[in-house]
């Protein structure tokens, strides 16, 4: 018995015999497999196949952001039909995201109704005095849910201590919280080492705790030095002392080459070390040339 999946084709070619009678050739029939109709293009997806002949199977897959609504494969039947019916690719959506405690929506735009599409994002922000732990942006995933939500926690910082030889100002309230600021300053002749303004961070600590550093009294009475690229008289520029962190370059003599060079000195919290090569010029030794007036090496 011949399968109904095979189609008969007759090749009725009549041949003329020598005796004048007509005869049918022996090989006149051919069977070929049934062919199912073209599966078409799967919108937002792909169809994987080799042929559409019985009993082949075709497969389906959707592009990122879409899911198969229906079967993942279909078979060509003896009747020349696909079974099960061909699927469609439906768009993945996420419901409105839950809002974390002590948080609010910063950026949120739905794609259809109240739902969001795959890879749509939502941005959260924390209420005042609450710090965010985790990513502020969540994304609609291929599974139809949102990536991990952030957490908003209340953060408090201790009252900042007043630095020695300085002062600090901060908001007059019982508790200092996340993002609150404090401003530091120093008394005269002292310089702030660190930022003037600091902030309460999410760790419960201040971003910095600056201190006040003392100025330096110079043992040198008169000298020409380099300060910030300019030649200055040390007795004029630093008559009240050098501030912490200030740098100057003293002129020194190279006796062998009869030329001058410079050595750096820096004031560090009330202390400055004068270069050993420096010799303070005496007005009594008027015949001697000051190192600052000697040709550079």
Curated annotation (Swiss-Prot):
Gene3D superfamilies: Complement Module, domain 1
SMART domains the UniProt entry points to: CCP (SM00032)
Intracellular or extracellular location(s): Secreted
PROSITE patterns: SUSHI (PS50923)
Disulfide bond annotation, renumbered to this chain: 36-76, 62-89, 94-140, 126-152, 157-200, 186-212, 216-267, 252-277, 259-297
Record-annotated Sushi domain positions: 20-32, 34-91, 92-154, 155-214
Residues spanning the signal sequence: 1-19
Glycosylated residue positions: 69, 114, 135, 145, 205
Single Gene Ontology MF annotation: identical protein binding
Keywords: Disulfide bond, Glycoprotein, Heparin-binding, Repeat, Secreted, Signal, Sushi
Protein name listed in UniProt: Beta-2-glycoprotein 1
């Amino acid at each position: 018995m011949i399968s109904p999946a095979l189609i008969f084709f007759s090749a009725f070619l009549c041949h003329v015999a020598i005796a004048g009678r007509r005869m049918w050739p022996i090989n006149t029939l051919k069977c070929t497999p049934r062919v199912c109709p073209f599966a078409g293009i799967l919108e937002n997806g792909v169809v994987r196949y080799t042929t559409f002949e019985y009993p082949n199977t075709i497969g389906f897959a959707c592009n990122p952001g879409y899911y198969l609504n229906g079967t993942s494969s279909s078979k060509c039947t003896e009747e020349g039909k696909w079974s099960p019916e061909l699927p469609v690719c439906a768009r993945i959506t996420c419901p409105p995201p839950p809002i974390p405690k002590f948080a609010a929506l910063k950026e949120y735009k739905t794609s259809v109704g109240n739902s969001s599409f795959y890879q749509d994002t939502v941005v959260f922000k924390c209420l005042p005095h609450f710090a965010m732990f985790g990513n502020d942006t969540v994304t609609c995933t291929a599974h139809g849910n949102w990536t991990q939500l952030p957490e908003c926690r209340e953060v408090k910082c201790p009252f900042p201590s007043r630095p020695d030889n300085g002062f600090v100002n901060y908001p007059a309230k019982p508790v200092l919280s996340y993002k609150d600021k404090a401003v530091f300053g120093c008394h005269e002749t002292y310089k702030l080492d660190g930022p003037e303004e600091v902030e309460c961070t999410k760790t419960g600590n201040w971003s910095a705790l600056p201190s006040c550093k003392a100025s330096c009294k110079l043992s040198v009475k008169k000298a020409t030095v380099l300060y910030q690229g300019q030649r200055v008289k040390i007795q004029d520029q630093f008559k009240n002392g050098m501030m912490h962190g200030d740098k100057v370059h003293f002129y020194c003599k190279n006796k062998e080459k009869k030329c001058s060079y410079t050595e750096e000195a820096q004031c560090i919290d009330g202390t400055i070390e004068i270069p050993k090569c420096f010799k303070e010029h005496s007005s009594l030794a008027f015949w001697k040339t000051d190192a600052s007036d000697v040709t550079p090496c």
